[in-house]
């Protein structure tokens, strides 16, 4: 079976869906909506699904939720700016950012707890006005790798 492994969207409403074979997923469900679909996500959590991909196209949100994701718990941080305090609180509780997406006025971060705790995982976030190529290369040298990228407005 093929399952959605990544999605992306553009300001003009265009989208890209990547489907992969051989993933660990057992079942998927997706939703496209004009506002962030909190109620739908909560309903799917109760059914054993977890957010595994997320994107925006213009002002619309696309969320993919899967069974068999390897997560034991998940939470959402949704904010008009960057929800620094919420993210740090979740990091301290063992959650890691597993998906990000933003519209012009909102940014969403999915933080998940893996079923099997990784030995020692560290995360950092960076907000920039241009892609941080040099910064990324410096972090690669310290064994930090890109987990998620999203495009949104930056606030100075």
Range-by-range predicted roles:
Residues 1-156:
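Terminus-proximal functional modules
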